[in-house]
C-alpha cells in the first residue's frame, strides 16, 4: 500500500510533508509519496491574505484533491487551517509540536523595543501587526508576503529593518538562528492558534486512512490544540481578525492557556489566561472566546 500525501509545493511545506512520510514509514511500516500541489495562496503574493480570501487559500486546492481521492491525506501547518473544514474532511492527526514562538529577524535590533523610531517591519499577519503596534505605535508596518526564504532575503536586501517569522519554520528549514534572530517573549507576542504544529487532514469516511492517522497522532499536542481550536471555532475568526493563543501542559493532566483578540484599527485589545484539565480543554477554549464576545457587545 502506498499512501499519497498532498502538500503545498514550498520548501517548508515539503519538509513538513516529509516529516509525516517518515512517521508513516517508521511507525506503520508503510510507503508514502508526496504529491506537491500549487495553491492559490502561493500564487498570489502581492496582496494581503485578508483581501483575497484568507489563509484557507493555502488549503483549497489540496482539499479539492483530497475530496476527489487523488491524495489520501493532506499535510498543513495547523496555523493555516481555518476554524471549519469542508464537509467530508476533518483533522485526523498532528505531529508533536515544534517551537511555538515568533522570532524577530533583524540586522539592527535584538528586541522590538530596540528598533529605531519609525523602523520598517515587514509582515502580512494582522496578529503580528497589532501586537507590534501595541508595543511600538511608531513602527511602520510594511506588507510582507512570500515564503520564508523570500522574507528572509528581503531583510538582507535592506527592504525592511525587521520582520517576524515563526521559529518552527526557520528551524525546520535549518536556518542559522544564532545570528539576527531572537525569540519574542509571549508577553509581547502570542503565537497564532496551532503555531508550530504539523497537521494531517483526511476524509471522515475513509475507514482505512483514519485509523492509520490515529497511530501517528501525538496525543498531548492533540489535546492542547483542542483548547486553542475551541477558542478559534467559537470566534469563527479568519485572517483579518487579530487573534492568538497558546495552551501549555503544566503537568498532572493540567494545562494553562493565554488568548488575545484585537481589532485591526486598534480600537480594542483583549487578553486572558485560563487553566484547567485537559479533558475539559475544548470547552474552556470556547468559554474564553465567549467571554471576549461579551466584552465586545456590552
Curated annotation (Swiss-Prot):
Query: Per its Swiss-Prot or TrEMBL entry, what cofactor is needed?
Result: dipyrromethane
Name the Enzyme Commission number(s) assigned to this protein: 2.5.1.61
Q: Which GO terms describe its cellular component?
A: cytoplasm
Give the GO molecular function terms.
hydroxymethylbilane synthase activity
Keyword set, alphabetical order: Porphyrin biosynthesis, Transferase
Quote the PANTHER family the UniProt record gives.
PORPHOBILINOGEN DEAMINASE
Q: Return the NCBIfam families for the record.
A: hemC
Q: How does it assemble?
A: Monomer.
Q: What is this protein called?
A: Porphobilinogen deaminase
Instruction: Name its species.
Output: Orientia tsutsugamushi (strain Ikeda) (Rickettsia tsutsugamushi)
Amino acid at each position: 500500500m502506498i499512501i499519497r500525501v498532498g502538500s503545498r509545493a514550498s520548501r517548508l511545506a515539503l519538509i513538513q510533508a516529509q516529516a509525516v512520510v517518515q512517521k508513516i514509514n517508521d511507525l506503520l511500516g508503510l510507503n508514502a509519496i508526496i504529491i506537491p500541489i500549487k495553491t492559490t495562496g502561493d500564487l498570489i503574493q502581492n496582496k494581503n491574505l485578508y483581501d483575497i480570501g484568507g489563509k484557507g487559500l493555502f488549503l483549497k486546492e489540496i482539499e479539492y484533491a483530497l475530496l476527489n481521492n487523488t491524495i489520501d491525506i493532506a499535510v498543513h501547518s495547523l496555523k493555516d487551517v481555518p476554524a471549519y473544514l469542508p464537509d467530508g474532511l476533518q483533522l485526523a492527526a498532528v505531529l508533536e509540536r515544534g517551537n511555538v514562538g515568533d522570532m524577530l529577524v533583524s540586522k539592527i535590533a535584538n528586541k522590538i523595543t530596540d528598533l529605531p523610531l519609525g523602523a520598517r517591519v515587514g509582515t502580512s499577519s494582522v496578529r503580528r501587526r497589532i501586537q507590534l503596534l501595541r508595543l511600538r505605535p511608531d513602527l511602520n508596518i510594511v506588507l510582507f508576503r512570500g515564503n520564508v526564504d523570500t522574507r528572509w532575503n528581503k531583510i538582507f536586501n535592506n527592504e525592511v529593518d525587521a520582520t517576524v517569522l515563526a521559529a518552527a519554520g526557520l528551524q525546520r528549514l535549518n536556518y542559522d538562528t544564532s545570528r539576527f534572530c531572537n525569540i519574542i517573549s509571549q508577553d509581547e507576542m502570542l503565537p497564532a492558534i496551532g503555531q508550530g504544529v504539523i497537521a494531517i487532514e483526511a476524509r471522515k469516511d475513509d475507514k482505512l486512512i483514519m485509523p492509520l492517522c490515529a497511530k501517528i497522532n501525538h496525543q498531548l499536542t492533540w489535546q492542547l490544540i483542542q483548547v486553542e481550536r475551541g477558542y478559534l471555532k467559537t470566534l469563527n475568526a479568519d485572517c483579518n481578525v487579530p487573534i492568538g493563543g497558546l495552551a501549555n501542559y503544566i503537568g498532572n493532566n493540567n494545562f494553562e492557556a493565554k488568548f488575545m483578540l484585537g481589532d485591526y484599527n486598534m480600537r480594542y485589545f483583549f487578553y486572558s489566561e485560563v487553566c484547567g484539565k485537559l479533558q475539559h480543554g475544548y470547552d474552556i477554549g470556547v468559554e474564553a472566546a465567549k467571554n471576549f464576545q461579551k466584552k465586545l457587545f456590552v
